[in-house]
């Protein structure tokens, strides 16, 4: 898969290390880690992110989250010792006003893990989560004193159709963003569905990339395929990767932003 992604033309890659997935950080043995490390070192791709899913919704889940974040951090350093990728996750459901102080206190423990493992943890606002927009993530980060290893993931598909303007959300998120995820959101039969980046035409990726770049962001713009897409009958991951690449390469051209690669 790494070589295939490189052959399509991408500059970077993200690995899903969630429980039960192929690269599950709790299951990936030393032999496979060495193989992945070699493949990445020999590839033009940068490994920019490891995706987890560890919402700290109660004390038990917080304990699980802390353990899995430590496992993911270890994997990050095993795969790219000189520049370990960040770890990203959502924070789960609930009503924001009711759970935000609890989330803040639990994230304080995450920051200790990030500091101990020399790894960045990036929290992702999700439209169905308690933390659902950039302002929420910024509140948590600032409440904890802007720790350098606690950042956020920006994904406009979670803010679309919510009276949250693209430019405004970027302005709020930009100082704290370590990773940008790109996928489309569309309204179908009164519901919001996710699609491949550029497929629905609902998000101006050229404007998004341009504003982030002008604001000093130099991290990854990651093409994310939603489970709403990958779970469909007949889903073709290779075709999806090619479609996303073509759409986002064009967005970079429209933005007038030069892409950087592993070899730069």
Regions found by a protein language model. Give the residues of each.
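Glycine-rich, proline-tolerant flexible connector loops at the mouths of alpha/beta enzymes
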Residues: 14-41, 94
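Catalytic-core regions built around general acid/base machinery
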Residues: 30-42, 106-113, 168-169, 207-211
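Soluble or luminal CAZymes and related metallo-dependent hydrolases
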Residues: 28, 32, 64, 68, ...
């Amino acid at each position: 898969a790494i070589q295939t992604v490189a052959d399509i033309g991408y500059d970077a890659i993200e690995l899903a290390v969630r429980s039960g997935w192929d690269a599950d950080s709790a299951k990936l043995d030393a032999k496979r880690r060495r193989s992945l490390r070699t493949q990445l070192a020999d590839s033009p791709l940068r490994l920019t992110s490891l995706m987890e899913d560890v919402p700290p919704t109660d004390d038990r889940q917080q304990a699980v989250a802390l353990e899995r974040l430590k496992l993911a951090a270890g994997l990050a350093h095993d795969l790219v010792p000189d520049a370990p990728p960040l770890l990203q996750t959502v924070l789960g459901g609930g009503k924001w006003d009711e759970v935000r102080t609890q989330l803040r206190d639990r994230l304080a423990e995450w920051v200790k893990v990030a500091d101990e493992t020399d790894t960045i943890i990036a929290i992702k606002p999700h439209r169905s989560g308690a933390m659902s927009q950039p302002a929420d993530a910024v509140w948590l980060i600032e409440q904890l004193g802007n720790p350098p290893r606690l950042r956020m993931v920006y994904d406009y598909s979670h803010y679309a159709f919510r009276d949250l303007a693209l430019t405004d959300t970027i302005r709020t998120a930009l100082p704290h963003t370590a990773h940008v995820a790109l996928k489309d959101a569309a309204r179908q039969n009164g519901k919001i569905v996710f699609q491949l980046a550029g497929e629905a035409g609902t998000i101006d990726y050229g404007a998004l990339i341009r504003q982030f770049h002008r604001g000093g962001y130099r991290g990854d713009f990651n093409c994310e395929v939603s489970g709403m897409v990958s779970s469909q009958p007949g889903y073709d991951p290779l075709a999806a990767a090619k479609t996303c690449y073509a759409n986002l390469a064009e967005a970079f051209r429209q933005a007038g932003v030069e892409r950087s690669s592993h070899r730069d």
